[in-house]
Swiss-Prot record:
Positions annotated as WD repeat: 214-255, 258-297, 308-346, 353-390, 456-495, 497-541, 561-600, 790-829, 842-881, 1699-1744
Knockout-associated phenotype: Mice are viable and show no malformations. However, homozygous males exhibit complete male sterility due to severe defects in sperm mobility. Sperm from mutant mice is characterized by normal flagellum length, but most of them showed abnormal forms and irregular caliber of the midpiece. Females are fertile and give litters of normal size.
Keyword Thylakoid: no
Tissues expressing this chain: Expressed in testis.
Name under which the protein is recorded: Cilia- and flagella-associated protein 44
Primary localization: other
Keywords linked to the UniProt accession: Cell projection, Cilium, Coiled coil, Cytoplasm, Cytoskeleton, Flagellum, Phosphoprotein, Repeat, WD repeat
PTM-bearing positions, type Phosphoserine: 1069
Compartments where located: Cell projection, Cilium, Flagellum; Cytoplasm, Cytoskeleton, Flagellum axoneme
Keyword check for tRNA processing: no
N-terminal signal peptide: none
Native source species: Mus musculus
Length: 1843
């Protein structure tokens, strides 16, 4: 990144805004501080020079070079650059400097300008619009639009619809455009390798500035800041670089990578140029220009979606306060604050703001405008959005738009821009579905409807065709439209919409339509439509109208030959046959003359991409079929036969003549062949050079006359190894064939893509082989033509001019290439020179169609980028342009023709499939007829068989045939049964899914409608009356009904309750934690000591310690007992109430009694205070509601059980009556008819009494239901099949229910019959026996009379029994009915109460949130008050403890002085001195405690500066004259007293320091107490205010509850409010008082009377008790005084004086003495140990002494011997000397010195021995004082003696 070093002086004066000033200042600071490679240094060239080199290398514009070297004459020279020594040099551009447009833009490439002019094609007009390109609609002024069309920018005047074109400079496309805020400049960001951004001035359209090196491949978006001095750009893949430009200086200011995925947009914040925003694929990022220590940087913060789903963000807007409002894919608005989503905005009901993505968001005049893919523009309130915030966990906030404009459901708004028209609020909108709209967003009563200014194709253009007669062209695309244009007059004429997208198109030749009015279009669903174009002005229908369209399209024919998209259409050269090709691998032929009657089709080995009939020069009519997968077929023209369609079974053409060429890749062979040729040419050149060199050498030899010249070594180059030839390569996937054309009969040229691109291949069909397999066939082309620069850019389409001298090629990258050919050159020998120019977009603008006009004056192209271009072809003849094309006149009678029925269903049958379906239906019809005939025959045979069976039954038994005799063959029956079972299994398998589906459906219905029911309505009828009783229809209680919210249902405890529950021991455990921890640590240490081995001394010491501990513990227990007793006395005295003490509870009770005495406070009273236990909330009310429902449900369930029991009783009664009636019938058969009593009618069961049987069914019921349903469906029409089936289902259900009830009746009858038979069997009735008639005897007559009497009695008994059963049942029913009526009344009251409770619950829920807030505040303040009160109590306790400690320390200090005074005794003359020593103040170093705090560090620093640990100071009480020295004990002063004074002084200082510390702690505690007390008062005030607020809110809630209407039924005797003895009409002023409350008040009177008598009795008893206690107190006082006197006498008798018994009890041991004893014991043990050690050392030293003595003795003996020998030698020597002369006399000096040394050594050793003996003696004594050994220093070290 390169940054400017200084600012342009011309611009610097004009920039006055705050942001620009900041930016310039930061840039200067950056340039002055940054020394990285991005900034300029001395001697480094500016990037302009580098760019010039690159431009020169790329053969691009030379304007920059001219700018550096010499300016053009038309340009003003740039401002001269002042060169300063040792300073950076920077080019400064003048404001009047412009680049040269002709030298800047890209120009066509011409291989040879001699044959082809440079401007062979000139852009005439653009009919397309890349509507899916982001921000591809800009407004330059009120009439001019700017948008990108391929490699051009189009300036469109939408008033007169003229166009101006600006060509790109790179020739590789344009990425983005942006307009200056002042509309004086616009930026064009291009594509290519390191593309440029060119700033054009408007309206002059001069290139003003060029920005370089901002992206690697292409730009995605550019945007000017609000002031227009900065430009932001963002690149596409792969770098995604965001750059901030100072565009007037052509300098990049900041640069960084924006993101790692596609970035859609970058914009400046309109209110702050230092903030930017980018958005793109799955992200949004917020940028800020920050000044860091390394300079000005661009820092980005990536937006975090959090819980929100990640979304691609197309549109956003920066709000003035720094927030950003963005859209989302699902249509909601996201409000960003910082880098987080603050809130997600949606519409009411959780509906999205737009149905689809939001593509643009704008701020305009305090409103937010959003445009979405749903075709709607919505206006939102800015303040609502700016202040939006989340209200719940969903993160959503519901808002509604202020205004809304819905354009159309087929509109997809991609971007919008406002028109600057005064007084209007017009906007231009880019529709991604192919339109530019003008919208009026004023939303007033004169608002205009949306106006479509321009309409285009949306997306890639699929096909283009031109009229063979005039300047008309037709296009189609996947946007389901067909459009016709007049490209000569530059006007779109007409367009027509369909349901499916168009994929191919052809204009019918004049041989088909003389007026060239027919257009054939193929669609993606396989349909082919023939459209007729005509001029409607010639119709009589439009006669007299003013606005008549220029052209109309009429659907003439429609047919569907294919099942997939139609990819190719071709008319035979005579126009007799139309051929269609498709992706479904079929070619279909139609007879054009017979209204496109289908001829037939055949299959191909691959999807078809092109069809071409042989030209007229070929002898035969053949069709060239090019498939995508490498197959090229040739078919003869099919013969047209007059065959009736009804007789044709299939349209497949049999025995079709096909020749196939299966293309095999030969590119690697061609490359190998070309390489071989190149090497051969190189060899030939080398040989030629060798020959020339030899000839030259021969000439030189002749010139010099030399005979032989050595030959040059020329074989070096030949000996070099050549690289290997390219390998033969076959691509794994065959290369697709893109296009092709005939050259000669049986020969053709093809262009391929992928690997085989770069050549045109000349191929020839092999000879025809019948039944050959195309898959196994492999063919290679026999010739090829090399195409320059098409390795990665193959030819997509090829067309020729009418005279075949120009070949127009449409390239894959959107370029046009024109080859100039010779006449009659089918082999393309002259394919060398060409004209090449990029027109469409290089990335996605592949040319789909290219064709010339009928007279070769125009060339038309259509690309996948949605652009349609018309070019003027260079011609030597001047042809008039702009002539309006003639639209064909309408045919006669066209207006009266009925339009054919269109095929709109994409799943409709194709022609072949429809024919197959028809044949299949015919076949199935014949099969069904045959089956019906067979069934009729079988039916006849079956009837005959049944007749035979009937005849067989009529025969006698012995003559009848058995059923098995009719079986002809058992195997046949077994086989039939087997097949039947297999068929059943198969059917079950086939219907398993349906079965499970219906079972699940039934289960779901039952779960939905029957499962929730606990009991259905059961109606029980009486038998002898019309009375009936119905049960309740109950739903099962929900499992969630009993749940409650414990946090809300719990009532806040009152203060009294809390105080009672807490008790005195609250938080005491917090105190004891430290002690418990320390005890635990001590126990751990003690456990650790057990593992160490103990010595005897340790055991003795521990025993002594244990004894002392026991004594101390005994004394501590006594002391603890005394203290406990004192504490109990203190508590007892503290609990003693004062004489005027009153119990607070009694006071409160008396106060409440006085307040509410004689007053029953109503809830409607304004001062009504709700007690805490009566406060209600939503949860409690919900519990009441649940309890009421439970109670009502329980009562209803109990009543249902009773009714069900009654129903069961009726069933039992009916069963018994049926048995009795059957028995009655049997009895009446035995008595005369005259004595028959009428048989009682048996009660019947109604369907309402057994509703559960409605859902019981059997197979017969289901079959009947199916038959009924089928009949109803047959009767209903096909259009009303849905409603009809529903109605039939309902009717069937009713019939099914009726059938079910009938079946139940049968079952009941059957059951009754069975029961009657059982009853008769039990009664053992005599069966009638048939006898022959005879005269009865007298005995028989007597028996008959007796039986008759018996039967008559039984008849009467049975009738009575039946009557009794019915009457009893009816009585039970009446009784239960009466109970149910009462329960119904209660249930109605319950429902009314339920309604009231529900209303109260809803009201309480509204109050719940605020109440919870107030309650939470009260609870928090209450808890805070309790905590502070506890802190106060704790502080008071600590203060009391510290005061006790201070008192103890003061007592210790007094005791210290008293003890020292006693030690001094009387008349001690050093008393004053010693007292001064004791009282002297000394500065001591502060002791570092183990458990230090934060202040110890400072104390340690201060103590480290002290010179010594003790430093004397003067006594404060004395004067300066009283200075004395306390370091030396005075003469005659007792040393022990002096030492005691020093020790006690240390103790005094310790006590004083402790006192100071304790007083500091007390002061701190007082301060803390005061602070907390103040806080308690504040909290108490706040608590009272909060409780009052809560109480007021409770009153408000109660008042709102009182406003609810409650229904209370009253009887007249309950009304006691009478006026003149009558009930008044208006009862609004009455009070409804419950009996329960009234009874309670009356009971309260009795209770109070009883309580009064009880209290009087208790008062009397308390007075008697008080008198008794006073008497006992006097007696106890006398007893205590007697006991005190006895104790005093005992003390005097035992101790001689009165002593302190407590001190005596606590006196156990003298701890100091015991400690000294333990120290003494330890010292003795250590001394004994040390004594043993010294004894061992003495023994060792004695041994060493003895050894040394022996050695010394030995040495002395040696010395003695040596001395004797020396003496002898001396005497001999003396003798010799005396003989020689007496020169020397006496001993030598050396001998004297040696002798003295030996003597001293002996003396020293003797002294050591004496000292050691004394020390040994001393150590042997017990109490001897051990002194250091005497080691006398030797004066001189012993030197070795000379021998």
């Amino acid at each position: 990144m390169k940054e400017p070093d200084d600012q342009d002086t011309s611009d610097g004066g004009r920039s006055g805004s705050r942001n620009e000033g900041k930016l310039a200042h930061k840039s200067i600071l950056k340039s002055s501080q940054d020394t990285t490679a991005d900034s300029y240094t001395d001697g480094e060239e500016s990037y302009l020079g580098d760019d010039l080199d690159l431009d020169d290398m790329d053969e691009s514009s030379h304007s920059s070079q001219e700018y550096v070297q010499a300016p053009a004459p038309s340009q003003e020279p740039p401002v001269e650059v002042k060169e300063e020594p040792e300073a950076d040099v920077k080019k400064v551009l003048s404001e009047t400097f412009y680049y040269d447009y002709p030298e800047l833009v890209s120009i066509p490439y011409v291989s040879s300008e001699e044959r082809i002019p440079l401007y062979f094609l000139t852009l005439n007009h653009s009919f397309g619009y890349d509507c899916r390109k982001r921000a591809n609609l800009q407004l330059l002024d009120s009439n001019t639009l700017l948008y990108v069309a391929g490699n051009q920018m189009v300036l469109l005047d939408f008033k007169d619809k003229t166009q101006i074109y600006l060509q790109s400079s790179s020739g590789q496309g344009i990425g983005a455009i942006g307009v200056h805020p002042k509309k004086t400049y616009f930026a064009v960001a291009e594509k290519g390798s390191f593309p440029k951004i060119i700033i054009y001035e408007y309206p002059s359209l001069k290139p003003y500035r060029i920005l370089r090196d901002g992206a690697e491949k292409a730009y995605a978006y550019v945007d000017f800041n609000n002031e227009g001095n900065l430009l932001a750009s963002v690149g596409c893949h792969p770098d995604y670089t965001i750059t901030i430009w100072g565009w007037k200086e052509e300098q990049p200011i900041l640069r960084t990578k924006a993101f790692s995925q596609d970035v859609f947009k970058v914009t400046f914040n309109p209110d702050n140029d230092e903030q930017l925003t980018t958005s793109g694929s799955g992200h949004i990022k917020f940028w800020e220009m920050a000044f860091t220590f390394t300079g000005l940087k661009l820092q980005g913060s990536l937006g975090r979606f959090g819980k929100t789903s990640t979304s691609d963000i197309e549109g956003y807007a920066e709000l003035p306060d720094g927030k950003v409002l963005s859209g989302s894919e699902w249509g909601n608005l996201l409000l960003w604050e910082g880098s987080l989503i603050k809130v997600e905005l949606c519409r009411t009901g959780m509906k999205s703001c737009h149905s689809g993505s939001i593509n643009q968001i704008m701020l305009d005049e305090g409103e937010v405008i959003t445009a979405g893919s749903d075709g709607s523009v919505r206006i939102w309130d800015f303040e609502t959005i700016d202040t939006a915030d989340v209200i719940d966990d969903t993160g959503l906030l519901e808002i509604e738009p202020i205004n809304e404009l819905h354009i159309d459901k087929s509109v997809n708004l991609f971007s919008m821009i406002k028109m600057n028209e005064v007084g209007n609020n017009f906007w231009l909108a880019q529709d991604a579905n192919g339109a530019i709209w003008k919208l009026d967003l004023s939303f007033s009563n004169i608002t205009q409807d949306p106006e479509c200014l321009f309409s285009f194709h949306s997306g890639p253009i699929a096909a283009l065709a031109v009229s063979p007669l005039t300047y008309l062209m037709a296009t189609t695309a996947m946007d389901c439209s067909v459009r016709v244009y007049d490209f000569s007059s530059k006007n779109p004429l007409v367009h027509m919409k369909f349901k499916q997208g168009g994929t191919s198109l052809i204009w019918a030749p004049r041989s088909v339509s003389v007026s060239a009015s027919q257009i054939v279009v193929g669609f993606q669903d396989g349909v082919v439509r023939v459209l007729e174009l005509f001029d409607p002005k010639g119709l009589t229908v439009y006669a007299g109208r003013k606005k008549i369209p220029d052209a109309e399209l009429h659907l003439k024919y429609v047919f569907k030959p294919h099942t997939d998209e139609v990819t190719a259409l071709a008319y035979e050269r005579d126009g007799d046959i139309l051929a269609t090709g498709s992706e479904d691998k079929t070619v279909f032929f139609f007879d054009v003359e017979k209204e496109y009657k289908p001829i037939g089709f055949f299959n191909t080995p691959g999807p078809i991409c092109q069809l071409m009939w042989s030209p007229a020069s070929h002898p035969e009519k053949t069709l060239l079929i090019i498939c995508e997968n490498g197959y090229i077929l040739e078919s003869l023209c099919p013969t047209i036969k007059d065959v009736d369609d009804q007789n044709v079974i299939t349209f497949a053409i049999p025995n079709v003549f096909l020749r196939c060429f299966h293309f095999t890749s030969v590119k690697s062979k061609i490359l190998r062949f070309l390489e071989v040729q190149r090497r051969e040419q190189q060899k030939m050149l080398k040989e030629k050079e060798k020959l020339e060199r030899r000839m030259k050498l021969a000439e030189e030899r002749e010139a010099f006359g030399e005979e032989e010249i050595p030959e040059e070594e020329t074989s070096e180059e030949g000996e070099e190894e050549e690289p290997p030839l390219p390998e033969i390569f076959m691509p794994p996937t065959p290369s697709p064939i893109l296009c092709g054309f005939y050259s000669e009969p049986g020969k053709f040229w093809v262009s391929l893509g992928n690997y085989d691109a770069g050549f045109l291949y000349h191929c020839q069909f092999p000879s025809y082989l019948h039944n050959s397999d195309f898959q196994k066939q492999e063919n290679e082309p026999f010739d090829f033509r090399v195409l320059e620069n098409t390795e990665d850019n193959p030819i997509r389409n090829i067309t020729f001019s009418n005279d075949q001298t120009m070949m127009f090629c449409g390239m894959t990258n959107g370029a046009i290439r024109v080859y100039v050919l010779s006449e009659n050159d089918p082999f393309l020998v002259s394919l060398q020179h060409y004209w090449h120019f990029n027109v469409h977009d290089n990335n996605y603008g592949s040319i789909k169609s290219i064709t010339s006009s009928f007279d070769d004056q125009y060339l038309l192209t259509a690309g996948e980028d949605g652009n349609i271009f018309v070019f003027d072809i260079f011609s030597e003849f001047i042809v008039p342009k702009g002539i309006k094309a003639k639209v064909p006149s309408p045919r006669f009678g066209i207006e009266s023709e009925a339009a054919p029925e269109d095929i709109e269903d994409p799943k409709a049958y194709s022609i072949e499939n429809a024919r197959k379906k028809r044949e299949h239906d015919k076949l199935m019809k014949k099969v069904e007829e045959l089956k019906a005939h067979k069934r009729e025959q079988i039916k006849i045979l079956r009837n005959e068989f049944w007749k035979l069976l009937e005849l067989n039954k009529e025969l006698p038994a012995h003559m009848q045939f058995q059923r098995t005799d009719f079986n002809i063959d058992a195997k046949i029956h077994a086989e039939i049964h087997k097949k039947t079972s297999l068929k059943i299994e198969q059917v079950e398998k086939e219907l398993a899914w349906e079965k499970q589906k219906h079972e699940l459906g039934l289960k779901k219905l039952q779960d939905r409608f029957r499962e929730p029911l606990e009991s259905d309505t059961i109606v029980v009828y009486a038998t002898q009356s019309d009375h009936q009783i119905a049960s309740y229809r109950l739903v099962k209680p929900s499992k969630y009904s009993k749940l409650k919210r414990p946090s809300q249902s719990e009532r806040r405890q009152s203060k009294m309750e809390r105080l009672e529950k807490e008790g005195p021991g609250k938080k005491e455990s917090q105190r004891d934690t430290g002690g418990s921890i320390s005890l635990q640590e001590e126990s751990v240490l003690e456990k650790g000591k057990k593992f160490r081995p103990r010595t005897l001394s340790e055991i003795m010491v521990e025993n002594q310690i244990e004894k002392t501990k026991k004594l101390i513990q005994q004394a501590e227990r006594a002391q603890f007992k005394i203290l406990q007793r004192k504490k109990e006395w203190e508590e007892l005295y503290k609990s003693k109430p004062d004489d005027d003490y009153e119990d607070p509870k009694d006071v409160q009770a008396i106060k409440e009694a006085q307040t509410y005495m004689g007053d029953f406070n109503l809830k409607t009273a304004p001062d009504y205070k709700i007690p805490e236990h009566m406060r209600i909330n939503a949860a409690k009310k919900e519990e009441e509601l649940g309890y009421l429902d439970t109670m009502a449900h329980g009562k209803k369930r109990y009543m249902n059980k009773c009714i069900l029991s009654l129903r069961d009783l009726k069933l039992a009664v009916i069963e018994e009556i049926q048995c009795l009636v059957q028995e009655l019938k049997n009895i009446q058969s035995s008595i005369p008819a005259s004595k028959h009593m009428p048989i009682p009618q048996v009660p019947q069961i109604y369907p309402e009494e057994v509703p559960e049987r409605r859902f019981q069914y059997d197979e017969e019921t289901l079959l009947r239901f199916q038959r009924k349903q089928k009949k109803r469906q047959d009767k209903s029409s096909s259009k009303q099949s849905g409603t009809g089936s529903g109605g039939s289902a309902g009717g069937g259900l009713v019939g099914f229910l009726k059938l079910s009830s009938g079946k139940e009746g049968d079952l009941t009858t059957r059951d009754s019959l069975s029961r009657s038979s059982k009853a008769s069997a039990l009664l053992e009735l005599p069966k009638p026996v048939e006898f022959e008639k005879a005269e009865p005897s007298d005995a028989e007559l007597e028996i008959m009379k007796r039986d008759e009497v018996k039967h008559l009695y039984m008849q009467q008994f049975l009738c009575n029994r039946i009557n009794e059963l019915t009457v009893t049942f009816d009585a039970e029913l009446h009784l239960l009915r009466h109970q149910k009526l009462k329960l119904d009344t209660k249930m109605k009251l319950s429902d009314l109460h339920h309604l009231t409770l529900f209303q109260e619950m809803l009201l309480l829920k509204n109050f719940e949130k605020q109440e919870n807030i107030l309650q939470e505040r009260v609870n928090s303040l209450d808890k805070e008050e309790q905590d502070m009160q506890w802190k106060i109590n704790e502080t008071l306790k600590e203060m009391e403890e510290k005061k006790n400690e201070i008192t103890k320390l003061q007592d210790q200090e007094k005791a210290l002085y008293a003890g020292f005074q006693a030690a001094l005794g009387e008349n001690n003359k050093f008393a004053n001195f010693l007292m001064k020593v004791l009282k002297k103040k000394i500065k001591r170093a502060k002791k570092k405690e183990v458990e230090g705090d934060a202040d110890e560090d400072e104390e340690s620093e201060e103590s480290s500066e002290e010179e010594s640990s003790l430093e004397s100071d003067e006594d404060a009480s004395g004067s300066e004259d009283d200075v004395f020295d306390d370091s030396i004990c005075p003469t005659n002063c007792d040393v022990s007293l002096f030492e005691l004074a020093l020790q006690l002084r240390e103790k005094r200082l310790d006590i004083e320091e402790a006192l100071v510390e304790e007083k500091k702690i007390v002061d701190n505690l007082k301060k803390e107490y005061d602070t907390i007390s103040k806080k308690v008062k504040v909290v108490a005030t706040n608590l009272n205010a909060a409780e009052e607020a809560l109480e007021a809110y409770q009153r408000e809630k109660q008042q709102r509850l009182n406003e609810l209407l409650v229904v209370i039924p009253l009887k007249l005797h309950q009304i006691e409010y009478m006026e003149f003895g009558e009930v008044p009409e208006d009862l609004s002023g009455t009070l409804v008082f419950s009996n329960h409350s009234l009874d309670r008040l009356q009971e309260r009177i009795v209770q109070l009377q009883e309580e009064n008598a009880k209290q009087q009795k208790l008062n009397k008893e308390c007075r008697e008790r008080r008198k008794l206690l006073i008497r006992e107190k006097r007696e106890m006082a006398k007893t205590i005084s007697k006991m005190e006197e006895t104790v005093r006498e005992l003390m005097i008798s035992k101790f001689g004086r009165v002593i302190d018994l407590e001190a005596l009890q606590t006196l156990s041991v003298n701890t100091t003495l015991e400690e000294l004893k333990i120290k003494k014991l330890r010292k003795e043990l250590s001394n004994a140990k040390e004594l043993r050690m010294w004894e061992e050392k003495i023994a060792q030293v004695r041994w060493d002494l003895m050894m040394k003595t022996k050695e010394h003795t030995k040495k002395l003996h040696q010395m003695n011997d040596l001395c004797l020998e020396k003496k002898k030698l001396d005497s001999r020597l003396n003798t010799l000397q005396n003989q020689q002369g007496n020169a020397f006399q006496g001993l030598r000096k050396a001998d004297i010195v040696a002798k003295q040394k030996v003597t001293e050594l002996v003396q020293t050793q003797l002294e050591k021995i004496t000292a050691l003996k004394e020390e040994i003696e001393l150590l042997r004594k017990k109490g001897g004082l051990l002194l250091p050994p005497i080691t006398p220093k030797p004066k001189n070290e012993m030197k070795p003696m000379d021998t």
